[in-house]
Amino acid sequence: ATTRPETMFGDTAVAISKDNEKLKHLIGKECIIPIINKAIPIIADDHADPEKGTGAVKITPAHDFNDFEVGKRHNLPLINILNPDATLNENTPFAGLDTQTARKKTIETLDSLGLMDKIEDHPMVIPYGDRSGVVIEPLMTDQWFVDAPKLAVEAMRVVENGEMEFVPKSYEKTYFEWMRNIQ
């Protein structure tokens, strides 16, 4: 069971709790992602709650914050399935479709393969952008990091040497405190 079938193409594992008496015999085996016929491991992780749903949880580290943490714990690959405009990319059979259309196509395809058991309403919190009103999709992007403490040393030096000064001077104390505690 899943609330986001269109993300199955980015799944890298299925998690089951080691305390799940009904399913723990599957840990260490593999299962197949339908439609793309890709094998992924079944792993033991307490992120899967034996009392919730089927007790097994698909893990999509590139598109879910909780799954990302599971992926880090198990060294799972990150498979990005989204373009920057939130359409599905070439890692899926539905490249170019928006997520809602891809969801419908995924469900239709699963149904045509005889793999759809049932559809139930499931209340959940969906994040929307404050200004855009659009669903926020977790998306892996490149990020760059600077060594802020190293930059702070030079920034403090120019103030200490009088090459730069604050007006009013009272802000200097706040500046130095901020720079000494920068991370």
Regions found by a protein language model. Name each.
Residues 52-183:
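Residue patterns forming the tRNA-binding/recognition surfaces of aminoacyl-tRNA synthetases
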Residues 1-3:
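Short hydrophobic beta-strand that contains or immediately precedes a catalytic carboxylate
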Residues 5-84, 154:
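Catalytic alpha/beta core of large soluble enzyme barrels
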